[in-house]
Design a protein with these regions (language model features):
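Canonical P-loop GTPase G-domain recognition
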Residues: 45-48, 54-109
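ATP-binding Walker
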Residues: 112
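Active-site flanking residues adjacent to catalytic metal/cofactor-binding acidic residues
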Residues: 23, 51-52
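N-terminal accessory targeting/assembly segments
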Residues: 1-43
């Protein structure tokens, strides 16, 4: 199972131009995958931290997290909060990298809102 997981992760990283890591805004340290982040950084591709479930997170903590993780966008899949900001961030990063129609890959632990 672990081999299959990394095979999928490596495939997503290989195919995508921009990658989104979906993280639970209430438990960032527990839901980030530093190995995945390292693989993305080594690939030279853009990683956007997507802080899902922001409607359930402490606002003060969320502001600190957004400053520490860059680029990041706070969203709530439940009520669609932040989706336009996420689209805008993807467009900004795509233009910065010269992609007209970027392939976007989504990574993260299960139950994070992918």
């Amino acid at each position: 199972m672990a081999g299959n997981f990394w095979s999928v992760v490596n495939g997503v990283i290989s195919e995508a131009d921009i990658l989104l890591e979906i993280i639970d805004a209430r438990a960032v340290a527990q839901t980030r995958n530093l190995e995945i982040e390292d693989k993305v950084k080594k690939s030279g591709k853009t990683l956007i931290y997507v802080l899902n479930k922001c409607d359930l997170a402490d606002k003060g903590d969320l502001d600190k997290i957004k400053k520490a993780l860059s680029p990041s966008v706070a969203i709530s899949c439940k009520d669609h909060h932040g989706m336009n900001l996420l689209r805008e961030r993807i467009i900004i990063e795509a233009k910065r990298k010269g992609f007209e129609k970027p392939k976007v890959g989504v990574l993260g632990y299960p139950n994070m809102g992918k």
